[in-house]
């Protein structure tokens, strides 16, 4: 299922984002051996002979159903296209209290060959640390624009807790 920025189902019809069919049986699996807990590991790859590919990039949710068409689980994934450049710096926080516990991200969105319509409203930024969505930083508006470039040079809004990944930056 194709989704919008906030992971709600988009208005696109299936044939607008997918080449092929979306309802297929997963037939590739391996059973566990020499384990205390028995399990099966299922695999599916895209594109394949039934689902030939995707027409648009964006957020997707794959939903796995059992034989009774009940949801077993679902997973989010993102299909990326490199349409803009995003130079980024990881810096020390400006607040001394956060100096040894957080990292600050400064970046800007530099559209290469595409025209952005109302970019302050339409460009959606999500900052992920190690692909962990529950700590994602979202809904950041640019601090300022220069030409077509959108600049994000905040002191607090783009900070992550460093945790075990803390790096000391010495300039």
Annotate each predicted stretch with a short phrase:
Residues 36-65:
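Ligand-binding face of N-terminal immunoglobulin V-set domains in extracellular IgSF glycoproteins
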Residues 25-30, 43-48, 90-94:
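Short structured motifs
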Residues 5-7, 50-52, 65-72, 132-133:
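Short acidic/polar inter-strand loop motif in beta-rich domains
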Residues 1-39, 116-141, 154-171:
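Contiguous segments within soluble domain cores/interaction surfaces
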Residues 73-77:
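Edge beta-strands of extracellular beta-sandwich domains
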């Amino acid at each position: 299922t194709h989704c919008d920025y906030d992971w709600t189902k988009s208005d696109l019809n299936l044939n607008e984002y997918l080449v092929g069919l979306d309802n297929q049986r997963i037939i590739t699996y391996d059973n566990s051996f020499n384990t205390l807990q028995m399990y099966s590991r299922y695999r599916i790859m895209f594109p394949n002979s039934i689902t030939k590919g995707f027409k648009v990039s964006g957020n997707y949710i794959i939903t796995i159903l059992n034989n009774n068409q009940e949801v077993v689980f679902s997973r989010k994934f993102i299909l990326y296209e490199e349409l803009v450049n995003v130079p980024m710096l990881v810096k020390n926080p400006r607040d001394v209290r956060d100096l040894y516990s957080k990292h600050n991200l400064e970046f800007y969105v530099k559209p290469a060959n595409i025209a952005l319509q109302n970019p302050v409203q339409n460009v959606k930024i999500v900052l992920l640390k190690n692909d962990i969505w529950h700590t994602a930083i979202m809904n950041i508006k640019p601090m300022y624009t220069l030409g077509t470039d959108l600049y994000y040079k905040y002191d607090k809004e783009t900070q992550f807790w460093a945790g075990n990944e803390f790096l000391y930056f010495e300039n």
